[in-house]
Amino acid sequence: MTLPADQPDVVIVGGGLAGLAAAAALGAAGFRVDLHERRPFLGGRASSWELPPAVSNGQMDGDLKVAATSIDNCQHVLLGCCTNLLDLYERLGVRHLISFHDAVPFVTPDGRVSTMQERGGPAPLHLLASLARFHPLSWRDRLAVMAGLAAVGFEPAMLGRLRLDSETMLAWLQRHLQTPRAIDYFWRPVLTSALNEDPERVSAWHGLQVFWLGFLANRAGHRVGLPAVPLGELYGAQIPGVRVHFRSAVRELRHEAGRVAGARLDDGRMAPARWLIVALPFEETARLLPGDYSAFSHSPIIGIHLWFDRPLFEAPFAALLGRTVQWAFRKLGDPGYVQCVVSAARELLPMPPDQIVETAVRELREFFPNTWAQLLRSSVIKEVRATYSAAPGMEARRPSPATPFANCFQAGDWTATGWPPTMEGAVRSGYAAAERVTQAAGRPQRFLLPELPAEGLSRWFPTARITEPRP
């Protein structure tokens, strides 16, 4: 098919991280790309929202003021092991806006803090000293955790992906004799925040993947990266070789003779292209492409935004143990602004916002009892369809980038990326779909980066020899 000079080579449907990754990679490779996003901003579920005008103007209840003008739907973080997400930030020119933190404070409801950070030694011993001092756990609990982490270095290679994907992470933990307190105060907080799913519901394969890549394989894996700006600013830059069309929803794909001829937009216009990438959540992909998506379901996240009249705590963030709120993040530009996160938040979805705020404030006062901060303002954002649920058995159901149409590919964190539903997984899917386009065009290129290599003593664990399949 020959297109006019002003027509794109590739049409990408969806401006979330998967679509952004595909667009940035193909644009840099010399392809003309049109990206269609139905909303007025990029980033998909990792986006920002404008505050109501009264708050944006700094006015609330007379003399009380709130400095922030926009908020993220939910605080998003990345780990040092997210190699492809960091590569995308380099491509977008925003890598310098990500700050990494080696120390991760865990706080119990009595206000005591244990910090997980590298304290010397080769991987996987770099966090051992922190674990030995982890006050929420008894020595019996800590020894159980150490034994469980050692099993992470062996069992994925011994049993394989599909075997471990057939059981829940909770079943795996119980099979490895983890104590109830070790599960609730160590394994559960990490797993739920990383996978947006409870150990009772999530695949053991992905649970072990989190601890291998984030805790054991490489000393840089556990470092927490936080954007220094609202998420909307991360994805606001121009992408070389890419034209972005906002408020441009795709109604259907036009196809003939086993190929997609183009995308029909909501206004009736056709967007022709040689190649097309559908980079949408699974429920929206089902509207455009044939396939069985019935096995996929969602897991929600709730972001609770609180403005106090003074700082609540000093650290940039903290993991909160044993309560409903799982993490709290302090915005450095606005000391009284705290973002709280509840992942896998099914139980909170029916609750009205006022009740959710009341719960969060009450719990924050437990964790930080010495503050006299008064709440000025609050906002609750419920992401009902935040991620797909990485339940046991889903690995075999996740599709490759290929579709029934030779020139059309699909991307999204729900596809077969080798990763759980994370920002890294979304970027990996976009790069994988972009690689398929270059192959179809006879100009094959590699965009996917390998995972952080196992280093130190971790190189000798059998799990280090598992190679993630390319999507």
Description of each model-found segment:
Residues A54-G160:
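Dinucleotide-binding Rossmann-like beta1-alpha1 core, especially the glycine-rich loop
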Residues P8-L35:
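N-terminal Rossmann-like FAD-binding beta1-loop-alpha1 element of flavoenzymes
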